[in-house]
Amino acid sequence: MKKSIFFVPVLVLFFFGSRFSRVASAGDQRALAASFVFGDSLVDAGNNNYLQTLSRANSPPNGIDFKPSRGNPTGRFTNGRTIADIVGEKLGQQSYAVPYLAPNASGEALLNGVNYASGGGGILNATGSVFVNRLGMDIQVDYFTNTRKQFDKLLGQDKARDYIRKRSLFSVVIGSNDFLNNYLVPFVAAQARLTQTPETFVDDMISHLRNQLKRLYDMDARKFVVGNVAPIGCIPYQKSINQLNDKQCVDLANKLAIQYNARLKDLLTVELKDSLKDAHFVYANVYDLFMDLIVNFKDYGFRTASEACCETRGRLAGILPCGPTSSLCTDRSKHVFWDAYHPTEAANLLIADKLLYGDSKFVTPFNLLHLRDL
């Protein structure tokens, strides 16, 4: 998740954004017109390139398989596409959502959607402070306020409201950093854990997320997909710092994720479903989906679910981020993890497929294809 190299591939992002600036045909009412993406490094499309932050992915070999940039890094924390990229493509979106902080995030480019996600960001404002700068969820929603005003100017108030309510998808992939880079940070958070129980910490997360989702609803967001927290105790970083073997995971980290996920499901499928008129919330069970991938990785064609494809060798393996000095695996399609924290494009494709077309085991109350067509 962390990056210390401050090279910014602005030209790559600008070229990429202009190349895919076409808006979905007005006659194709089933196609997804716009995708608004909120979250952390799992779906960051390059916002952190424009921040002075330690959380960056703007150096090779990141993006090596991202075809629109011809293999150049764009700020995505993976070798290719993120889950949000893939979902947008499959639902008919004509262009990837442009990063909010990118110079070409204006005018008609906004009509394809905007990506506000930021590596290191969390639900809570204190999360990710170890990276110096990042966009937390509150700031991301603030930025959408600006985008919403631009839509009224571009389309007029009535058309803008219908465009956002009926033909747009709001994806929220956040929460992992609130544990990994807040509650579970070694030494930094130890004192806080003495005074704040897991229950009260999760309560705080849910309270903040509730308000953030309501703010989006008040600005005409109606179709939501919200991912729960994955089994963060099984990522290479956690295995490395806790000196675990390939088959072991960190119990505390996974228990915290499970506790939060239960509260999140109630928030989405009961509370907000009943209180926010005409809103549709899909609960994406990323935890079980990813755990299935980790446990049964061979069944999905992977060689390993514990070793990162791009990593530093030796005693720091599984800790340092992917960068120019990292060792790269020979076959990226055989690794579940790209680096110590993030999945490969191959894993993202499998996860996205389950979210798009899967059953209630992984998406509740229905899949994303159904959500789009409502």
Curated annotation (Swiss-Prot):
InterPro entries: GDSL, GDSL_Est/Lipase, SGNH_hydro_sf, SGNH_plant_lipase-like. Its main location: secreted. One of its GO terms (cellular component) is extracellular region. GO terms for molecular function: hydrolase activity, acting on ester bonds. Pfam families: Lipase_GDSL (PF00657). GO terms for biological process: lipid catabolic process. Its EC number is 3.1.1.-. Residues 1-26 form the signal peptide. The active site is at S41, D339, H342. It is found in: Secreted. Keywords: Glycoprotein, Hydrolase, Lipid degradation, Lipid metabolism, Secreted, Signal. Coiled coil: none annotated. Glycans are attached at N104, N125. Belongs to the 'GDSL' lipolytic enzyme family. This is GDSL esterase/lipase At3g50400.
